[in-house]
Amino acid sequence: EMTDTCLIVSGGPTDRKFAAEFVKNRKYPYVIAVDAGLAVCEELGLVPDLAVGDFDTFGLERMEELKKEEGWATDVHKPEKDETDTDLAVRSALRAGFHTAHVLGATGGRLDHELSNIHLMRAAKDAGLFMEIYDAKNRIFLLTPDDEEYSVFLKDRIYGKYVSFLPLTETVLGITLDGFKYPLHNKDISILEDPSLCVSNEIPGERAKITFRKGILICVESRD
């Protein structure tokens, strides 16, 4: 039972087999469906607590019918809005008092949506919501220097074989990688000079740790 973690099912393409497996072992107290994410929820037999978006993909009428049957809350917006549907879902998660959100359907479709979701993770983090984006091959989250809980990587707990760190800020200062196949000591990296320095690292032993002094990193745990 994950009391302070909600699930956001976004509208991007979702590997149904993976999603079914993912939600099977996790009990979320609150589920937010984002537009076409409603179709995924429907297939998985997940009843959302809230459906958010303009429903230009899922269809407003279809959404209204389903809502009558299942009785969840909705937050409907016009398509000409300034925020993406996932952004609206993040705001809803914060309003509902959650500190962590697992997000499905945020990757693998339109690249503009995928990149905006990664930028959204930063705004969400600043507002107090830690987002973890999952798909069949990746777990993505952001790291700041004070994230002690997320800076230790246990080999039998990570999502896949590889751990990559990409700078989200222009520079990230003082990176030390301990227990990784490719270690670093107090290294400053920048998007311009080292865009791929910390990609595809591995953990040969039981655990590894990252520390750094300043900046924000995108962490991707991935499997082939």
What are these regions (language model features)?
Residues 138, 143-224:
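Long, charged alpha-helical interface segments
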Residues 9, 32-35, 53, 75-76, ...:
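General beta-strand structural signal in soluble alpha/beta enzymes
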Residues 2-65:
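N-terminal beta-strand-loop-alpha-helix module at the start
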Residues 73-96:
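Short phosphate-binding loop-to-helix
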Residues 16-18, 83-87, 110-115:
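Short glycine/serine/threonine-rich phosphate/pyrophosphate-binding segments
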Residues 69-78, 128-132, 158-164, 172:
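A glycine-rich helix N-cap at a beta->alpha junction
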Residues 2-7, 30, 63-78, 205-224:
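Mobile, glycine- and charge-enriched loop segments
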Residues 102-149:
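Anionic-ligand-binding alpha/beta catalytic cores of soluble enzymes and soluble regulatory domains
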